[in-house]
Amino acid sequence: MTEEIGYPKFLKDTSVNKLKDNIYCGNLTDSWSIGGAVNGGYSMSIAARALSDFLVHKDPLSITGHYLSVAEPGPVELHLEKLSEGKSISNASVKFIQNGEERIRFTASFTDFEKSKGDTLYEREALKFPPLEECIKL
């Protein structure tokens, strides 16, 4: 059996389930841990998945994390609170709870990029990468 890697694994590892209107659950895997502590960006991705389902605006515009204590591999509960909802942006907070203790507090603004109007301006040239076969494999 080959080890699952890449985007499909990330989608699986960041999946959440809705328990109640504003409460979601997930499972932190040790695949995204360093020294027993779960990576903060991985934790933030789980919060973003829950927020995208919870809010009317589905695309993250800004997410901030306040890391209160170390999150560890295992079950997690996410308690979401909508702070405001406008035509183009929703704001919310997430309490990231393990074993009854709040580990992380996220605040976020979400939007809907499909409804954006106007031109998109790219001021930088796209990055150039070597062919995939020349990249380092882990």
Question: Which residues are covered by each model-predicted region?
Answer:
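Terminal targeting signals and extreme-terminal segments of soluble enzymes
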Residues: 1-138
